[in-house]
Curated annotation (Swiss-Prot):
Its cofactor is FAD; [2Fe-2S] cluster. PROSITE patterns: 2FE2S_FER_2 (PS51085), FAD_FR (PS51384). It is an enzyme of class 1 (oxidoreductase). The lineage of its organism: Bacteria, Bacillati, Actinomycetota, Actinomycetes, Mycobacteriales. This is Propane 2-monooxygenase, reductase component. Reductase component of the propane 2-monooxygenase multicomponent enzyme system which is involved in the degradation of propane via the O2-dependent hydroxylation of propane. Reductase catalyzes the transfer of electrons from NADH or NADPH to monooxygenase. It comes from Gordonia sp. (strain TY-5).
């Protein structure tokens, strides 16, 4: 059995134990403590600060924590192993979420439907079998296990807690992706898929009132659609401006539902941002040619007075992070998911 150590978190006065064979983040999940996190792969800069203790970090992106930050004492808890008792300062946390998040659990589901949305994005709908329903928040994600293997991939939920027994995921088919071939040929209705989760902090915060600027691209539509569905269902009174980046009009989807959801939100706008061509643009939709982050920059002069949510391929996420920094958006007003895929792994 691995040695265990005590971890103390400041300024929230929470303590827990961690084994030397698990990351601090995984130990927190195991004990019902929901620390701020995103990708869980050391790529998305959810940093904390070491006040005292002996730790080591596994492989991580220097974009998330550069050498100077690491030397100063910053750590990524998803990659950090403790080898002594430690005191850690949490730099970005939600007190309501810390001890009140949805429990991490193993879930058994069966495929209910597989439906193409665009030439390279598929809707995968799953019926929850065990337990009978799952608890999660709009904007979170699950790990899906490749049937018959221990391999897994993270996908955001497009549905809301209003349907805890039916989950929908929007999955982009990358060449060489483990799920890509299965979605095209190999996965069938009724087949069992194991899940684990929910994870992620790209969720709406209780009591927050700032306008929401949502920036999406590709399968990053999923968590933003979940947020829109939730706002529409609950009547939450917050302005929402949704910018979706795609290459051409053929890459746009769910436009009718987005329009319907928007009608139920007091102050809502949707802009399709097409980087390659605006030919054959759909009627009744605001379409602008160009990169989505450039278009947001041109249209959101007061971005720092909004809460920014984004989920997209890694290059678009990096561009959105740079945009938020350029506009001096406070870190606690930025929420995002940054998943990797075979197309972007280095």
């Amino acid at each position: 059995m691995a040695d265990t150590h005590k971890i103390s978190f400041e300024p929230v006065d929470i303590e827990m134990e961690v084994g030397e064979d698990e990351t601090i983040l995984d130990a927190a999940f195991r004990q019902g403590i929901h620390l701020m996190h995103g990708c869980r792969e050391g790529r998305c800069s959810c940093k904390s600060y070491m006040l005292e203790g002996d730790v080591q970090m596994d492989d991580y992106s220097t974009f998330a924590c550069n050498d100077a930050e690491e030397a100063e004492g910053y750590v990524l808890l998803c990659r950090t192993y403790a080898y002594s008792d430690c005191e850690i300062e949490l730099l970005n946390f939600d007190e309501d979420e810390l001890l009140g998040g949805a429990p991490i659990q193993d879930v058994t589901t069966k495929v209910a439907a597989i439906e193409p949305m665009t030439p390279d994005i598929v809707s995968l709908k799953l019926d929850v079998v065990e337990p009978e329903s799952v608890e999660f928040k709009s904007g979170q994600y699950f790990d899906l296990f490749i049937p018959g293997t221990e391999d897994k991939r993270s996908f955001s939920i497009a549905t809301t807690p209003a349907t805890p027994d039916r989950l929908e995921f929007l999955i982009k088919k990358y060449p060489g992706g483990l799920f890509a071939g299965m979605l095209t040929d190999g996965l069938s209705v009724g087949q069992e898929i194991k899940l684990n989760g929910p994870y992620g902090s790209c969720t709406l915060r209780n009591g927050h009132v700032l306008p929401i600027v949502a920036i999406g691209g590709g399968a990053g539509m999923a968590p933003l659609l979940s947020l829109l569905r939730h706002i529409s269902e609950t009547g939450l009174n917050r302005p929402v401006r949704f910018y979706y980046g795609a290459r051409t009009a053929a890459d746009l989807f769910l436009l009718d539902e987005i329009a319907t959801l928007g009608e139920k939100i007091d102050d809502f706008s949707f802009t399709a941002c097409l980087s390659e061509s605006t030919d054959n643009a759909p009627e009744g939709v605001t379409v602008i040619g160009g990169n989505v982050t450039d278009i947001v920059n041109d249209n959101e002069a007061d971005l720092a007075r909004t809460e920014v949510y984004f989920c997209a391929p890694p290059p678009m996420v990096d561009a959105a992070l740079a945009l938020a920094e350029q506009h001096s958006v406070p870190h606690d007003q930025i929420f995002y998911d940054k998943f990797t895929s075979p197309a972007f792994d280095s």
